Design a protein with these regions (language model features):
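C-terminal helix-to-coil terminal segments
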Residues: 51-62, 214-234
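Phosphate/diphosphate ligand-binding glycine-rich loop within oxidoreductases
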Residues: 2-78, 92
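A short helix->loop->beta-strand "cap" motif at the edges of active sites that frequently abuts
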Residues: 20-25, 45-48, 120, 178-180, ...
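Rossmann-like adenosine-cofactor binding region
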Residues: 11-13, 128-223
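Phosphate-coordination loops involved in phosphoryl transfer and adenosine-cofactor binding
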Residues: 23, 95-99, 170, 179
Length: 235
């Protein structure tokens, strides 16, 4: 009678609905998750489709957990203490650093606001972003190239679409500072994985904080599990 659909990329077409004659209610998590449901077919078949509010806050929290862990060397220090050691390095403060926000929407805005509390300068870019839209948030609107060149950390908050696949590729990664971090709590395909792994392996960028992956769970031998400059959390 009721189906709860959790994964937004799992399509729910007419053919599936027609095989469920008792189905009366189809639930999806998050507003965007209804996009892959055949809404016209649901209406015709008398199936009610309902979605929950998107949980932006949890993604914002995970984003900042990763940013802070990277800058402060959290995993290395905790690991050292657990092994009987003590301080291994010096954490880096956020005050005066530049955070690049790729996508200043429902998640990018609170991420930017928290950065400003820490004393960071926030710059942002997305394909349709304008200075008029960034000014109320005290965020500098910049070009895509400037964002990758100037940022000490870059966090991704754009939706997965044909236009955003591979938005961060070899060229963009080559523009990043040697010690800069890339944080992705958005969608994995926004970043071209092969040059990304190469940049992390060669340490041409400082590291990454990741909560989304092309394959979930990650294979045991995947670089995102093994590279010392990557913090991966299980989405």
């Amino acid at each position: 009678d009721v189906v709860m659909r959790m994964r937004e990329r799992a399509e729910f077409p007419r053919a599936v609905m027609e095989k469920l004659p008792k189905l009366k209610l189809l639930l999806a998590t998050g507003m965007r998750n209804a996009r892959s449901i055949d809404l016209a077919a649901a209406d015709e078949l008398g199936i009610t489709v309902s979605t929950t509010d998107a949980l932006h806050q949890t993604t914002v929290e995970v984003t900042w957990m990763l940013i802070l862990a990277l800058f402060r060397g959290f995993l290395e220090e905790v690991g050292s203490v657990r092994k009987g050691g003590w301080q291994r390095g010096l954490g880096v403060g956020l005050d005066g650093k530049t955070l690049g926000v790729l996508g200043l929407g429902n998640m990018g805005q609170p991420v930017a606001k928290i950065a400003q509390v820490f004393g960071m300068h926030v710059i942002a870019w997305s394909p349709n972003l304008t200075p008029e839209r960034t000014k109320p948030h005290d965020v500098e609107c910049v070009s895509k190239e400037d964002l990758f060149k100037r940022s000490d950390a870059i966090t991704l908050h754009v939706p997965h679409a044909k236009e955003t696949e591979g938005l961060v590729g070899a060229h963009e990664l080559s523009l990043m500072k040697t010690g800069a971090y890339l944080i992705n709590t958005s969608r994995p395909k926004i970043v071209d994985e092969e040059p990304f792994i190469a940049a992390l392996t060669n340490q041409s960028i400082g590291g990454a904080g990741l909560d989304v992956f092309n394959i979930e769970p990650l294979p045991d031998d995947h670089p995102f599990r093994l590279l010392p400059n990557v913090i991966s959390t299980p989405h």
